Amino acid sequence: MSRTKSSKRWLQEHFDDVYVKKAQAEGYRSRAVYKLKEIDDKESLIKPGMTVVDLGAAPGGWTQYASEKMKGSGRLVALDILPMDALPNVEFILGDFREDNVLQELINLIPQRTLDLLLSDMAPNMSGSSAIDIPRAMYLVELAFDFAEKMLKPGGNMLVKIFHGSGFDELVKQARASFEKVVIRKPSASRSRSKETYLLAKGYNL
């Protein structure tokens, strides 16, 4: 399929998408909010007073939802390589999480072992080739996991986008060695043809 036809199909699906319409009606910045909401409704991940980091935050759907759930208490830091409009009670870092100086800026904001929850919806720019895209995506997951291991408090939780493919089983195994509970979720708002799923790891063990 040509890129033009593929783009047209995506646009048509986007405008017909029930979650796009729902997000617009409810004032959310993106349909992705319903992926987090579905998981949070089942797992009660986000509570007032928490310290939360949201990686790959733009345009801000997940951050917006987390901010609402935290009710103005706690600390919420969002980071993305793309700009994001300001949200109440949110500290935003504009930068590439893969770069050391950006990572250090984030670390400087949050004392070590005080992080309650790491959220990551990071994904690379997709080329359409799984051989290229999956390794790039898994690298971002590995970086998020490394950050979580350094910053989460005992009992802390992590929710990260992860893609089926090379390295998937190894990362799940690694998570199970560090957390009390690890499950894979495919929210209803995640498009069925997408290889994305979400790894939920609860109860971090130091």
Swiss-Prot record:
Signal peptide: none annotated. It catalyses: uridine(2552) in 23S rRNA + S-adenosyl-L-methionine = 2'-O-methyluridine(2552) in 23S rRNA + S-adenosyl-L-homocysteine + H(+). It holds the Pfam family FtsJ. One of its GO terms (cellular component) is cytoplasm. It is an enzyme of class 2 (transferase). Its main location: cytoplasm. It is found in: Cytoplasm. It comes from the Bacteria. Keywords: Cytoplasm, Methyltransferase, rRNA processing, S-adenosyl-L-methionine, Transferase. S-adenosyl-L-methionine binds at G60, W62, D80, D96, D121. One of its GO terms (molecular function) is rRNA (uridine-2'-O-)-methyltransferase activity. HAMAP family: RNA_methyltr_E. Specifically methylates the uridine in position 2552 of 23S rRNA at the 2'-O position of the ribose in the fully assembled 50S ribosomal subunit. Belongs to the class I-like SAM-binding methyltransferase superfamily. RNA methyltransferase RlmE family. This is Ribosomal RNA large subunit methyltransferase E. It comes from Legionella pneumophila (strain Corby).
